């Protein structure tokens, strides 16, 4: 399936990583690519090996016209809910760009509240290079944060499962309780904290 780009001079792609995990921030990225400096091999970050993702992460940061990361921490996720916290994080990523785009393409079926034109693109991380680039920046950023969190809390296995509710993570949550970085509004964490 071919994506037909809207008519615009400066297009930013936006994607998020980390809506499903029980721990840590939801991380978003916004990227404006440089047509004069193409990047080969951009695709949905989930379809790339970690090695390839890391290489592309460096290349995107080097070659893009501009890029920015936006985030929402667990406290904000618990206060707003994951959907609205994700929208806020996307707004922060776009606001953080050093060049203002005239069009923003967002992965998924909903756009955040932006001061410029925007369009949601289902499967955008596979169809739109700018969104693929954003998905890679967001994923590598979040994965590295989970590796850091793993050093603080080595028993939970964060470096491996990245905070997603795997059987191992659920087992540790039940036996060790929640860390301060867990999302207290998420049902499995609520259960572990006896908040249900």
From Swiss-Prot:
Organism for this UniProt entry: Proteus mirabilis (strain HI4320)
GO molecular function: manganese ion binding; RNA binding; RNA-DNA hybrid ribonuclease activity
SUPFAM superfamilies: Ribonuclease H-like (SSF53098)
Family, as annotated: Belongs to the RNase HII family.
Catalytic activity as recorded in UniProt: Endonucleolytic cleavage to 5'-phosphomonoester
Segments forming domain RNase H type-2: 9-196
Name of this protein: Ribonuclease HII
InterPro entries according to UniProt: RNase_HII, RNase_HII/HIII, RNase_HII/HIII_dom, RNaseH-like_sf, RNaseH_sf
EC number: 3.1.26.4
Class of this enzyme: hydrolase
Cofactor names: Mn(2+); Mg(2+)
PANTHER family: RIBONUCLEASE H2 SUBUNIT A, RIBONUCLEASE HII
Cofactor binding, note field: Manganese or magnesium. Binds 1 divalent metal ion per monomer in the absence of substrate. May bind a second metal ion after substrate binding.
Oxidoreductase keyword on record: no
Function: Endonuclease that specifically degrades the RNA of RNA-DNA hybrids.
Residues reported in the UniProt entry to bind a divalent metal cation: 15-16, 107
CDD domains (alphabetical): RNase_HII_bacteria_HII_like
Record's subcellular location: Cytoplasm
Lineage top rank: taxon: Bacteria
GO cellular component, one term: cytoplasm
Pfam family, one: RNase_HII
Keywords assigned: Cytoplasm, Endonuclease, Hydrolase, Manganese, Metal-binding, Nuclease
Transmembrane regions listed in the UniProt entry: none
GO BP term (any one): DNA replication, removal of RNA primer
């Amino acid at each position: 399936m071919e994506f037909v780009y809207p008519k615009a001079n400066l297009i930013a792609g936006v994607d998020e990583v980390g809506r499903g995990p029980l721990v840590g921030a939801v991380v978003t990225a916004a990227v404006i690519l440089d047509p004069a400096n193409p990047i080969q091999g951009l695709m949905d970050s989930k379809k790339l090996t970690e090695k390839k993702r890391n290489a592309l992460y460096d290349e995107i940061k080097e070659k893009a016209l501009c890029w920015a990361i936006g985030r929402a921490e667990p406290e904000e996720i618990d206060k707003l809910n994951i959907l609205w916290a994700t929208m806020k994080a996307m707004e922060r990523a776009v606001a953080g760009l050093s060049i203002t785009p005239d069009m923003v393409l967002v992965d998924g079926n909903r756009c955040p509240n932006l001061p410029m034109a925007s369009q949601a693109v289902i499967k955008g991380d596979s169809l739109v290079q700018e969104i693929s680039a954003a998905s890679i920046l967001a994923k590598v950023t979040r994965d590295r944060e989970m590796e850091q969190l793993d050093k603080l809390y080595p028993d939970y296995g964060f470096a491996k499962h990245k905070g997603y509710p795997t059987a191992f993570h659920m087992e540790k949550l039940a036996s060790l309780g929640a860390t301060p970085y867990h999302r207290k509004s998420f049902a499995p964490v609520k259960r572990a904290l006896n908040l249900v």
